[in-house]
């Protein structure tokens, strides 16, 4: 396929040409499904807890608090961990809105088979776009007719080198960004490769803008390209190849996970 040196050429395509190559897809993306999730009291509480833990992580990576105060914090956190340990385990996102019970029942649920929004509730726990995951920066993504745009601000927990985002997190952001974009091709798949060019440092505590679009599709192969900018400065660009899943593969993944958790 084309090299990253062709990104400018790909970006210069008119919207009309790209619309002709990749007409509006019936595949509904994870972005749309997340927007359609019912905001239940439990989901709201999860997101609130995640936001507070995210704040703790950020504060802990940049504090100069003394040992006594840190020990007191650790004691408080241990109590919270104990409360969590006392509650039942499970994939809570499989039970939102009384959709399903767990595991294989989720996979067999007709709403899941019909690609209902709740099937995508797992993405609310994504480490990059999930508001219910404290590890998430989080990224904010927006779906358009022929591209996905978004923004993200990384805190101190993602630092390396000094003052900048660790390259591994930049790569993971691209995986999420391009993975959310591939549905514009008319199919959804799994990551085969990511080719990343780091053009300049990606700063912390700065709102970064992202953009991704479909570059090509041949049979089950989907090529997606994307960029990250700090204002007008390009910090990184990426090409990813995704292989669309065979029918029934997602359901099989759910079944396999359910079997593993029962053993």
Spans of features found by a protein language model:
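N-terminal acidic, proline/glycine-rich, low-complexity intrinsically disordered segments
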Residues: 1-16
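HotDog/MaoC-like acyl-thioester-processing domains
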Residues: 5-9, 21-116, 202-204, 215-263
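Active-site helix/loop of acyl-thioester processing domains in fatty-acid/polyketide metabolism
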Residues: 35, 141-147, 165-188
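Catalytic strand-loop segment that frames the active site of acyl-thioester-processing enzymes
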Residues: 41-59, 128-164
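Alpha-helix N-cap/helix-initiation motif
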Residues: 162-163, 167, 201
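Short, structured beta-strand/loop micro-motifs enriched in basic residues and often containing a Trp
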Residues: 189-193
